[in-house]
């Protein structure tokens, strides 16, 4: 009663309200922490605005009565939606008037009387402590009214009450328009739109990334296929290589020739600039050896001999080899002749030796005969000595002739 006096409510009680008051006290044994809101006429002048209460997975309505009270319906537990609640206009006014009862929110008393709360008042007393209600705060000891909130003007409260009463059947009241604040009490507005748009933005970003990655893969495949087709290996035939060498020589050598100019001179549809460039590099490294001159110090190119030069070199080397073989044969012949001359000389020497041996044997016989025939005349002895001397001279003359002939032959060779 003190809180009602603080808010300026009158203490006069109507007959119907007093009868309901006595019946409730008898039924619930006069609860000590119960709170009674009185004065029907005063509340008609200063009605309390009714609003929807939502929090988490529960929801409920605040129903107005004919006397201007706001009846707090139960917040549906276990995830019951607002659509399961009946509209405001479907409840009769007589029933709303009969349900203008004190706000009692003590959970311990509800637990002690589970069977007595089966009637429609059970939903009224099963009010959640976690649900925020404007100008009302539920506590374990009861429901207290926040005295710091200022009340609106009487005309605004009266208009809101009239609008709540005049709601048609089958349609729900627009609480955001009636209360003028859709951000704080609209359950749909508790979740800001940017948070709702975040998954959509993520999905669109992922789709864009997938599209970009697929496009990159397609472009990479196309570029790789184009490079592969442009850089296919080509077999250089001897005829094509000869044409390449002629084109390089026409352009002034491998250092001055460019792949583009060589490609124009070749005029082969199967060739590309990559083929000509690689072949030109190989031609430079294989066919030319850079050398530095002693005077200028600039690199000089020494061209390899062509096929004709190689053939001429082969002919020259073969001629030289044949000449060397001929000389070797001649030397061998001369050596063979010398061997024959030496053999003939050796035979002559042996012959002369045998002849001398015969002469010595004859002389020995003559001496023996002299000793045996001491009586022989000196003329016979002188004749024998003269024969021996003549034989020796002939032998020496023959030897000298053979030696001089062999010397002449050696000199001629």
From Swiss-Prot:
It holds the Pfam family Myb_DNA-binding. Residues 228-288 form the HTH myb-type domain. Residues 322-342 are annotated as: Coiled coil. One of its GO terms (molecular function) is DNA-binding transcription factor activity. Residues 259-284 bind DNA. Keywords: Coiled coil, Nucleus, Transcription, Transcription regulation. It is found in: Nucleus. Residues 171-196, 208-233, 363-413 are annotated as: Disordered. It comes from the Eukaryota. Induction: Not up-regulated by Pi starvation. Gene3D superfamilies: Homeodomain-like (1.10.10.60). Homodimers and heterodimers. Interacts with MED25. Does not interact with PHL2 or PHL3. Transcription factor acting as central integrator of phosphate starvation responses. Regulates FER1 expression upon phosphate starvation, linking iron and phosphate homeostasis. Belongs to the MYB-CC family. This is Protein PHR1-LIKE 1. It comes from Arabidopsis thaliana (Mouse-ear cress). The gene is PHL1.
